[in-house]
Amino acid sequence: MMYPQINSAQTIILYCEKFEFFNVVISPGSRNAPLAIGFASNDKFKCYSIVDERSAGFFALGISQQTQKPTVLVCTSGSALLNYYPAIAEAYYSEIPLVVISADRPNYKIDIGDGQTIQQNNVFGDHVIGFENLFQDVNHSTNSILESNLQRIIPDSFKTTELLDLQRKTQRDNERILLDLFIKTLHNSKPVHLNVPFEEPLSEFSDQPTITISNETKYSIKKDDLSVFNSPLIKGYKKIMILFGCANKGILSESTIDKLSSCDNIVVLKETTSNLNNTSFFGKIDQLIAPAELNENSSELFNKLKPELLITVGGMIISKKIKSMLRTYEPTAHIHLGHNDAKDTFYKGVEHFKIDPNLFFKKSLEKLVSNYNYKKPWIDISKKRALAHKKYLNKLPFSDLKVFSMLESRIPKKYTIQVSNSSTIRYMQLFDYNPLCKVYCNRGTSGIDGSTSTAIGASVKSAFPVLLITGDLSFFYDSNGLWNSNIKPSFRIIVINNNGGGIFKILPGYKNNIISTKFIETRHELSTKHLARMHGFEYSKARSEIGLKWKLYSFFKKSSKPGILEINTNSDLSSDLLKKYFINLK
């Protein structure tokens, strides 16, 4: 092992080891060499080399998504750091822990025309829950500091003994910073940023640690707030809706699921990314609600469907239709359960009960139950939609919607499915997938920019093989994600290529003209074939229903290389069929 002789770099590595932050994603550079070499030469760390920092950020996010532990990101100084920003914002809103460590020039070299320098302090602003700048060591390259002591970190009059005292204080302060910052990311499951100034030389190492760090951790797990059981909101209601957003599998125990399923006055709505598979819960939310908007008696129907008490669990809600419904037909009260952020998504105000959902329902369900049958209108509408859905799909020509209907029964069980944003995740929400699969999507910021990199990051830690289902724009946008030596042979990508942003065609007010085609839909004629070959993927293509059936038969079989299946569909036809789909369901 090689320990950097710069104390601050060595301290960071020792603290990451102490906190068991063992996954480290490193992008190349010279200013971060003390950290890169120190981490990579230590067998306790699993280090990944990713050149493109934007891709590296999402790759790290995918790792943390699966491990539920902070992943460390290490980059050099300058614009390299800024490329992390999209992933940092996504991690912040998806509540995924990351530790960003940026190497920097000493302060006196900033904004004087020195190379590869920018203002790195707090560049992520409110999108991290903590930023700290480590103090520069004074026992490393002391002469250089004194010669260019523009930041005055060493008084000119200091003697050797005073210099040692100053370094001891610097070490104590830096350890305090690391302790506080690492506890923040663990406690809040959000990203933090640590900026570290390094004076040259950067390539001096020793075989053994030259410092001893404190044993202090003072980290405690989150405690449930039992005072919530005294809330006046916990009482009998005729109509209770429990709405699950993005969540990991296992957020509800089987006993809790069984109890909720037996309550007629409680309706549970789940999204694809909720990873809840109980058949008595209502999925495919847009399929249930969107057609109701088209009915003449929509107001009467929505008043039947609206809850008195809304309980939300988990993260971001994907369905625009449930947001619209609950903003228009307001519940009396809104409670959010769990230690994650409570968001006032429905403009009603939200009471945050910081308690495990299983404990909450175990202790309070009897008080919430009533004899009113709130489930009946939901069951009736669900059955009606299911019949119309099946009838419409049976006569459907090859299109985006047809592709997703074919994937529904052909994705093998025990797959981790990563889904890109825009139309892809919204199509996914219209179907049921194998209950043994897990489904994830970057819904924190809902961007198309890092889906491939996130999926590859997830694949290195997932216990199941990983399938990415993505649209063409998202795939090409993040094509640098494929520039990665850590891709497993079991990794699969399905690209639905309709030659542009087809989702925009179904939005109200879209005009199908030259300007919209070029600047909104951004139509193109690109194929994924050459990218697949360049990055060592097996490539196949389907352009028809029969062709897709044949390709899917072999696509998931074990192979020596990862695979890309490109499915070509017609954008105009697909958008037209999706509009008619909701009309036919009403």
Task: Please place each PLM-identified region on the residue numbering.
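Phosphate/pyrophosphate-binding active-site segments
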Residues: M2-Y3, N139-D165, S324-S423, K529, ...
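Glycine-rich phosphate/diphosphate-binding loops that line cofactor/substrate pockets in enzymes
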Residues: T11-F21, I63-Q68, L181-S189, V228-I240, ...
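A short, small-residue-rich loop immediately preceding and capping a beta-strand
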Residues: F22-I26, K46-Y48, Q66-R105, F302-G314, ...
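Conformationally flexible catalytic loops at phosphate/diphosphate-handling active centers
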Residues: Y3, N149-R168, R172-Y237
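Thiamine diphosphate
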Residues: E90, I101, Y108-G130, D137-E147, ...
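Glycine-rich, anion-gripping cofactor-binding loops and their flanking helix/strand elements
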Residues: N83, F244-I335, N434-A463, F476-N480, ...
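N-terminal cofactor/phosphate-binding cores enriched in small/glycine residues
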Residues: P4-E90
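Active-site diphosphate/adenylate-binding microenvironment
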Residues: A9-E17, S27-R31, L35-A36, I381-A463
